[in-house]
Amino acid sequence: MLKVLFAGTPDVAVPSLKLLAQDTEHFEVVAVLTRPDAPTGRGRKLVANPVKQAALELGLPVIESDPSEETFVSELAATGAQAAAVVAYGKILKQDVLDALPMGWYNLHFSLLPQWRGAAPVQRSIWAGEKVTGATVFRIVRAMDAGPILAQSTVEIGAHETAGELLGRLAEDGSHLLAASLQALADDQIAPVEQPAGAYEVAQKITVEDAHIRFDVPVFAADRQIRACTPNPGAWCELHAHADAEPATLHVLRAQPADMSNPNAPASLEPGHIVAGKKNVWVGTSTEPLELLEVKAQGKKAMRAADWARGAHLDNAFCE
């Protein structure tokens, strides 16, 4: 039985933690390393992250110490862990920490490494228009996402899939890949293989400004941007509803290239200009229009775009 330290923080790490904790035939999760409680919401109350909540529900010891502290290595040794399983922990680990466990630290990364090393691999793969992505389990080294690979699995990216939806699928699929890889490693059935050399895309974090929708691009590019930025940080534009209206932020939660077989769909629109029908709302791009399906207006709840348009008093409206 492999004694494992689990390290993770957000909800995408929970499936892996639960799978390892429940597979008591092959694993003993000796402790869970996670980020400390953080202030959340308007009241700024301290709230435990999803991994800590899951660990407590599973009755597992929780470590919230900073890995940069001098006492951290001895704290690790006290757990008796042989290896660490890491999923979106969110902290850089020093070499002495990486050397502290006999079998090393193994990370589940949501891309087919070496492509898309970095913070936002799922979002960047959608934005780039890739058809296939996947998950990689690799041994952590000091260089970012550059360690030798244990295993990989692939998934197809759905034509209308958002980053949040794809990440949810990868988190579930990847949990099985991580468990199988660690089990095979413990049984000496696999060994890490160095990543191929070459130039690959880096998955830089997507900022709020990155999520500002561009309509002066082909419809497929606007669609990819929206899906890549959903749900976080959230795709948005500056709405000018009519001549007397103040500009307001409009979040686009779901959209798709217009169905040009719909007789009501405009053949073309100026980039950013909005046309609303009884059941549809379209906005122009540099090619075909983009159909807005679900939006969230400033100060309002999320709703179907057609319902929003009926109450928005749109007149020569446009987004920029």
From Swiss-Prot:
Any single GO CC term annotated in Swiss-Prot or TrEMBL for this entry: cytosol
Reaction(s) the record says it catalyses: L-methionyl-tRNA(fMet) + (6R)-10-formyltetrahydrofolate = N-formyl-L-methionyl-tRNA(fMet) + (6S)-5,6,7,8-tetrahydrofolate + H(+)
HAMAP family referenced in this protein's UniProt entry, alphabetically: Formyl_trans (MF_00182)
Record Pfam families: Formyl_trans_C, Formyl_trans_N
Name of the encoding gene: fmt
NCBIfam families: fmt
Species for this entry: Bifidobacterium adolescentis (strain ATCC 15703 / DSM 20083 / NCTC 11814 / E194a)
E.C. number(s) listed in UniProt: 2.1.2.9
Keywords of the record: Protein biosynthesis, Transferase
InterPro entries named among the record's database cross-references: Fmt, Formyl_trans_C, Formyl_transf_N, Formyl_transf_N_sf, Formyl_transferase-like_C_sf, Met-tRNA-FMT_C, Met-tRNA-FMT_N
Protein's name in the database: Methionyl-tRNA formyltransferase
Function field: Attaches a formyl group to the free amino group of methionyl-tRNA(fMet). The formyl group appears to play a dual role in the initiator identity of N-formylmethionyl-tRNA by promoting its recognition by IF2 and preventing the misappropriation of this tRNA by the elongation apparatus.
GO MF terms, alphabetically ordered: methionyl-tRNA formyltransferase activity
Superkingdom of this protein's organism: Bacteria
Chain residues that bind (6S)-5,6,7,8-tetrahydrofolate: S111, L112, L113, P114
SUPFAM superfamilies hit by this protein: FMT C-terminal domain-like, Formyltransferase
Phylogenetic lineage: Bacteria, Bacillati, Actinomycetota, Actinomycetes, Bifidobacteriales
Major enzyme class: transferase
UniProt family annotation: Belongs to the Fmt family.
